[in-house]
Amino acid sequence: MSKAPSHLRVIFTGTPEFALPSLRALAGAVQLVAVVTQPDRPAGRGRRLSPPPVAVFARECSLPVMQPPSLRRPEVVRALAALNPDLLVTVAYGRIIPDDVLALPPLGAINAHPSLLPAYRGASPIQRAIADGQTETGVSIIYQTGELDAGDIILQQRAAIGPEETAGDLERRLADLSATLLLEAVRLIAEGRAPRRPQDHAAATYVGKLTKEDGRIDWQRPAEAIVNLVRAMDPWPSAYTFRAGPQVKTWRARA
């Protein structure tokens, strides 16, 4: 039996600013029974414990927040099960969600990923697409499985990458697009009309987490590749080189 989206009991999992447009959109469309995000981390020069952006926003909206150190703990799984969720929605949570949690909601678990899957599965699809010189990317809404970003596709939309667009610029646009597509996917799921298109796993490509070393400029590479790296590493970790000893960060480049 289908439900109106406003009657769906939804658990949201997400952590960084990228997830905020989606959380904001869902907060006005469904019953958010829990917002699950990562624990507070040391940040800034003083390394003081700071909550992630999703936790800050959720508390401002009086939404119930959970920050478990691990979703694999039995007591955490029991607490989530007690919420009787219909659906689980993930946007950039930053950790693999275990099968025990994915199996809780009867309508399944879905994820917004900022690439045209099966390309750029993994943790840094926006930065890698720019660094590779791609002129197009997009957002995929998929069903979550135990395999990284490998679930069936519900919705997918393309987005151009501007010739001077940085990772920060593109991330903001794709965050908004993710929110729009997620709302549509939730509506289709609630109505029992969500499509499922299997991914071509043979065509999958993978990208890992960014490190500071990824920003180091290799001057032996073509000029266009260096320009793309500078765009891809803005705002973090930033492209850099060394000149007479000190590290020099590079924010803009032209070929």
Where are these regions (language model features)?
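Amphipathic, non-transmembrane alpha-helical secondary structure
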Residues: L20, R24, V77-A81, L183
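Structural motif corresponding to alpha-helix initiation and N-cap regions
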Residues: L20, R48-P51, R73-V77, R95, ...
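N-terminal beta-loop-helix "entrance" segment that forms/cooperates
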Residues: R41-C61
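Donor/substrate-binding cores of folate-linked one-carbon enzymes
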Residues: G28, Q38, L87-Y206
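Internal anion-binding site segments
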Residues: S2-K3, H201-A255
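N-terminal Rossmann-like dinucleotide-binding module
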Residues: S2-G46
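Internal alpha/beta domain cores that form substrate/cofactor-binding pockets in large enzymes
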Residues: R9-I11, V33-V36, P64-L83, L88, ...
